[in-house]
Amino acid sequence: MEDRLHMDNGLVPQKIVSVHLQDSTLKEVKDQVSNKQAQILEPKPEPSLEIKPEQDGMEHVGRDDPKALGEEPKQRRGSASGSEPAGDSDRGGGPVEHYHLHLSSCHECLELENSTIESVKFASAENIPDLPYDYSSSLESVADETSPEREGRRVNLTGKAPNILLYVGSDSQEALGRFHEVRSVLADCVDIDSYILYHLLEDSALRDPWTDNCLLLVIATRESIPEDLYQKFMAYLSQGGKVLGLSSSFTFGGFQVTSKGALHKTVQNLVFSKADQSEVKLSVLSSGCRYQEGPVRLSPGRLQGHLENEDKDRMIVHVPFGTRGGEAVLCQVHLELPPSSNIVQTPEDFNLLKSSNFRRYEVLREILTTLGLSCDMKQVPALTPLYLLSAAEEIRDPLMQWLGKHVDSEGEIKSGQLSLRFVSSYVSEVEITPSCIPVVTNMEAFSSEHFNLEIYRQNLQTKQLGKVILFAEVTPTTMRLLDGLMFQTPQEMGLIVIAARQTEGKGRGGNVWLSPVGCALSTLLISIPLRSQLGQRIPFVQHLMSVAVVEAVRSIPEYQDINLRVKWPNDIYYSDLMKIGGVLVNSTLMGETFYILIGCGFNVTNSNPTICINDLITEYNKQHKAELKPLRADYLIARVVTVLEKLIKEFQDKGPNSVLPLYYRYWVHSGQQVHLGSAEGPKVSIVGLDDSGFLQVHQEGGEVVTVHPDGNSFDMLRNLILPKRR
């Protein structure tokens, strides 16, 4: 064993002595490590010079001698080469020196280095060929400052630790804010269970041996990069490193960063060429700079991006470097900034950027994939039990009595595809499957960060609807959970299913409904007599639910100008620009009663990859210097159900004309001209809804045509009414 280990001076130990580590000490250190969240390597770097964004402020900051910088390092780790990472060079020694030993696969040594080992250094993976690589020994100061949880991390094929290092310039509040912005967008693109994102400060970048344990270096600062740090970054590239530059002064390979005042903080149209030569067009926020080729050129890589303007300004370049696979993708558009950034000044710019937000993520993922990272969809979360909750205390006892009479001998209520097993408590050993889900009846055991029962109770002002709640953190789809209950439960119990996430959400025509955390997801059970105003006009149900969502937000005092709209037949929109939610209705006629499941989902807090209600509130506050508070999903679901019950009552009492004025106030189609069937189809003008809830359009010849929502869809981008794909 001794001859497989090396110490700092290159010697091998004569003897290995086992040391007993006390469990109490180990647990204390692990607890301290796990409680840290910020991935900061060093506290205070040296300040750097900042490059001004004026016309000449970034002229010719490219390095025009890549040959001198791109040479392969000739000396191995431990040499005194100036191109080697700082901290890896030979250290001077006196007559008495202490050299420290570390086995690469030893977690205890890493996590106890402060209390047990004076200074742990890396054991070379090359010198321990048949021991497993352990990336937990990535930086000597990690255990001192912060150390992420290491369980379940995926080892990548490069043999390097899965570290993504973010360099954002000098140590300042502005830089810290930039770090959080960049970290947030990268965490949305890659699997954070497979990669660790660190804040790389200047002192640490110069001193620590990070280059051997870095999969990707992200440089996101407009400040000039000190020469010694620049050389460090180039040495990393020459060793096969990968670099992503985000609106940064960093460049090489004959490319120069030059400023162009007309582009500064403006929204431009970008044409991005992917590795397969396909193109993506999107609106982007320009940094005010562009890339120009200098006298020395390198062959460009597979990715390119230019503005759709007369000069076709180069904004994204892909530059290979060296002979060991080093490469960089450098950008002068703000892919790291959300549309809600303070840099975005006007509502028009916000709309353009939000409309391209999904494509912004598409471009980022393409870049990260090209640089060797995995941007696969995150693992589907495990299903969780349902909790049976009640919004009114007086309904709890009758509910439990009803359940006692209707469950079978195994405590289950079964439908064709699903069994609900009612239990007083849940233990994690019980398997949860899409076909068998436990329902916990003990309300005292319930707690969730995504659903506050008290907030829901306070804002639910109904006589029947939404009184009994089935809540799940993660469930396949809320639409199936009431199959075995919808024909049996008394009307006064008002069943609703609410979920924080769905793994198999459904939309119209079998479309998949993406349901991340931050959506308000619910399925509500209502019953409508066949021989009633609404029973004779069932298509109106989806319209009532859509308008209930909009009214639930816009009827809040001071929120009346939040630009939520309804789009025929079943969507909730931001203005006429972007979908923010939708409604799905399934109805079954049994005897003289329609039993209707209304599925509804709309984005409340999840800004990415598209848009959410709180984005609209943030933008409204910015434009009007207001201080409207962000909203919660549980709060809004309660308000939606309350508004819906009121609309149903008005409809039943007075017919469709009692609710149509509210519907028309919020819908996006008034006077709109569209084509039926295809772009070559007949041109018509939208009139409104007929007495049955179907869309009426006026043809040029004078004929009024009715379009049924079941089987047709409205394409807002092309002004078409098309058959719904199935």
Swiss-Prot record:
Tissue: Widely expressed. Mostly expressed in muscle, placenta and to a lower extent in the brain, kidney, pancreas, liver and lung.
EC number, as in UniProt: 6.3.4.-, 6.3.4.9, 6.3.4.10, 6.3.4.11
Effect recorded for residue 508 to W: In HLCS deficiency
Outcome recorded upon mutating residue 615 to Y: In HLCS deficiency
Domain BPL/LPL catalytic: 463-652
Effect ascribed to mutating residue 241 to W: In HLCS deficiency
GO cellular component: chromatin; cytoplasm; cytosol; mitochondrion; nuclear lamina; nuclear matrix
Impact noted for substituting residue 216 to R: In HLCS deficiency; has normal or low KM values for biotin (non-KM mutant); growth of patients' fibroblasts is compromised compared with normal fibroblasts; patients cells are not sensitive to biotin-depletion from the media; growth rates cannot be restored by re-administration of biotin; enzyme activity is severely compromised and cannot be increased by additional biotin; turn-over rate for the mutant protein is double that of wild-type enzyme
Pfam families in the record: BPL_C (PF02237), BPL_LplA_LipB (PF03099)
Impact after mutating residue 333 to E: In HLCS deficiency; <10% activity; has normal or low KM values for biotin (non-KM mutant)
Reported effect, residue 547 to G: In HLCS deficiency; 3.4% activity
GO process annotations (BP): biotin metabolic process; post-translational protein modification; response to biotin
Effect on the protein upon substituting residue 550 to M: In HLCS deficiency
Disease: Holocarboxylase synthetase deficiency: A neonatal form of multiple carboxylase deficiency, an autosomal recessive disorder of biotin metabolism, characterized by ketoacidosis, hyperammonemia, excretion of abnormal organic acid metabolites, and dermatitis. In holocarboxylase synthetase deficiency, clinical and biochemical symptoms improve dramatically with administration of biotin.
Function: Biotin--protein ligase catalyzing the biotinylation of the 4 biotin-dependent carboxylases acetyl-CoA-carboxylase, pyruvate carboxylase, propionyl-CoA carboxylase, and methylcrotonyl-CoA carboxylase.
Protein name: Biotin--protein ligase
Species, as recorded: Homo sapiens (Human)
Annotated gene: HLCS
